[in-house]
Amino acid sequence: RAAAGMATPTLEAARRGLPNTLYGVSLLHEGQVIGMGRVIGDGGSFFIVVDIAVLPAHQGRGLGRRIMAALDDWLRANAPPSAVVSLVADGDAKHLYAKYGFVETTPHSVNMEYQVE
């Protein structure tokens, strides 16, 4: 996460959270993880795409699309028809996500969060 410019959870948070991943993708190059993404949620009504990241040295090669395609395939095969799939799109990544059916929800709703201290 840090190498891709994303916030890094504490080791304890990662130990608790990662086992609850519904589906995850890791892209490897010469034994090193260079890209990742995962789906979390309740497994029925709500699914959230998180942790989409590709190392800067490997960006611009379509790897983000490969990650999203794998997650999208899994969601379409496993989520029930009434399920809602959401994500937070940073910057121009919204254009990638739009290719998989994601639409902006603003101004009807906005992303809100807080970090536990």
Task: Locate each region found by the language model.
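Short amphipathic alpha-helix that is part of the acyltransferase structural core
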Residues: 1-11
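A short helix-loop-beta-strand connector motif used in the catalytic cores of GNAT acetyltransferases and
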Residues: 15-26, 81-83
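Conserved beta-hairpin
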Residues: 22-37
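Conserved acetyl-CoA binding element of GNAT-fold acetyltransferases
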Residues: 45-56
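Conserved acetyl-CoA pyrophosphate-binding loop and the N-cap/start of the following alpha-helix
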Residues: 58, 62-70
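Conserved GNAT acetyl-CoA-binding A-motif
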Residues: 68, 75-89
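Conserved catalytic-core motifs of GNAT/GCN5-like acyltransferases
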Residues: 82, 86-88, 98, 103-117
